[in-house]
Amino acid sequence: MSLDIDQIALHQLIKRDEQTLDVVLRDSLLPTNAVVEEMMAELHRVYSAKSKAYGLFNEQSELADALKRSRKGDEDFLSFSRAATGRLRDELAKYPFAEGGVVLFCQYRYLAVEYLLISVLSSCHSMRVNEQLDLSTTHYLDINRADIVARIDLTEWETNPESTRYLTFLKGRVGRKVSDFFMDFLSAAEGLDTKAQNRGLLQAVDDYCADAELGKNERQAYRQQVYSYCNEQLRAGEEIALQVLAQELPKLGEKDFQQFSAEQGYALEESFPADRGTLRQLTKFAGSGGGLSINFDALLLDERIFWDAATDTLTIKGTPPNLRDQLQRRAGSK
């Protein structure tokens, strides 16, 4: 992995009681060695694989102003990280899910792009066996479960300040959303809405097929082509590029897909990240609620599965063998 660490600082937040969150600050940057490089490579890998939200700094963002000073050389990276950790403590202490942890600030390069990653990592306990086969306790950073993480694409931020996607952060699931907490700490606003972009793409595909008056099977085959490209991009960690997608799709009528979507005003970006859950709707129907979960291929609609909109009734002809076996055994036990 071509990841080059420029500067890295570690500090710590210690929760003394329900109202007190203390700060322990390092007096020097963390020396870069093989252990540090391995840790950052793992954190970069884990973060890159997770679903993220996008944002941009508010005009009055203190962290953005401090970062600009650091980038210009008016303030060194260690001082920047120490002051930011203090603001982080003040913000985090407002929320009920506040816990201690190791606060990490790392400025690094990956594939010619400069990043600043900020994270609060939990420390976990485990057991180890030494060479004498004795047991002892050990502590480790729980990188795989890190959920308080934000990353700033410094290259994008400095070369394209109007961008709405140079800042990314993870969406948490405890108490008030961790994403809300990071918005407050960073003084940032939500930027590119990835799910909205993917929903817009699906709508554009359906409208394009309808405009060409494709039949049911032709329409589903077209959706499958769109899904195949998007899924490949998702698996490769790449974005959906409308121009490339349009080149891979058969042209319907006088306009290709990119021309059609631009003229119809779907407000799609030239490229945007793929959203797995939204894209799945191209080939499947799925839903759950009230103790019921249903998932089936879109091709089965009106073939083996029928929906009556008037009565909101779904009729299934031919049940899966394992389901049928369970139903028969339950019926036989009555």
UniProtKB/Swiss-Prot annotation:
Keywords linked to the UniProt accession: Cytoplasm
A cellular component term (GO) from this record? Answer: bacterial nucleoid
This entry's Gene Ontology molecular function terms read: double-stranded DNA binding; single-stranded RNA binding
Q: What is its main location?
A: cytoplasm
A Pfam family that the UniProt record links to this protein: NA37
Q: Where is it located?
A: Cytoplasm, Nucleoid
Q: Classify the source by domain of life.
A: Bacteria
PANTHER family per UniProt = NUCLEOID-ASSOCIATED PROTEIN YEJK (PTHR38772:SF1), PTHR38772
Family, according to the entry, reads as follows:
Belongs to the YejK family.
Protein's UniProt name: Nucleoid-associated protein YPTS_1390
